Regions:
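Beta-strand-rich domain onsets/edges
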Residues: 1-16, 22-25
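Short, ordered, surface-exposed loop/turn motifs in non-cytosolic proteins
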Residues: 17, 24-39
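Short, acidic Ser/Thr/Gly-rich low-complexity loop/linker segments typical of extracellular
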Residues: 40-54
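A short, solvent-exposed loop/turn motif at the edges and junctions
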Residues: 42, 65-85
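Short strand-edge motifs at loop-to-beta-strand transitions and within beta-strands
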Residues: 53-57, 92
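Short Pro-Gly-centered beta-turn/loop motif in secreted/extracellular proteins
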Residues: 56-67
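Short beta-strand edge segments in extracellular beta-sheet folds
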Residues: 82-91, 97-99
Length: 101
């Protein structure tokens, strides 16, 4: 289940996925690859976090069920696969918080 941030969405456009990837201690993680996969498990977007650990897609996803998977590794940190439903609404920023391995 996704953890939504209290931050305002970066856009009012529906079906735009954005958020932040953090370590368990709250530190942001720059340069991580995030994959957004459709219900068939096919990657439909690949993103890289910026210097602040933030990510965002620039074009909206088609309505449906998607998973967010951290595609690169971080020393001693693992991430759950997050499932989201996209349904023509503004999506609040999502926080992916790592767990100590």
């Amino acid at each position: 289940k996704p953890k939504f941030s209290k931050m305002e969405p970066i856009t009012n456009e529906p079906n735009i996925v954005s958020g932040m990837i953090k370590k368990s201690d709250g530190d942001s993680i720059p340069g991580l690859v995030l994959l957004i996969k459709n219900h068939k498990g096919e990657a439909v977007r690949a993103l890289k976090t910026n210097a602040l650990g933030q990510f965002s897609i620039s074009t909206p996803l088609v309505d449906g069920i998607y998973t967010l998977e951290v595609g690169s590794t971080v020393e001693d940190t693992t991430f759950d696969i997050i499932t989201i439903e996209v349904k023509g609404e503004v999506i609040p920023p999502i926080e992916l918080i790592g767990k100590e391995a």
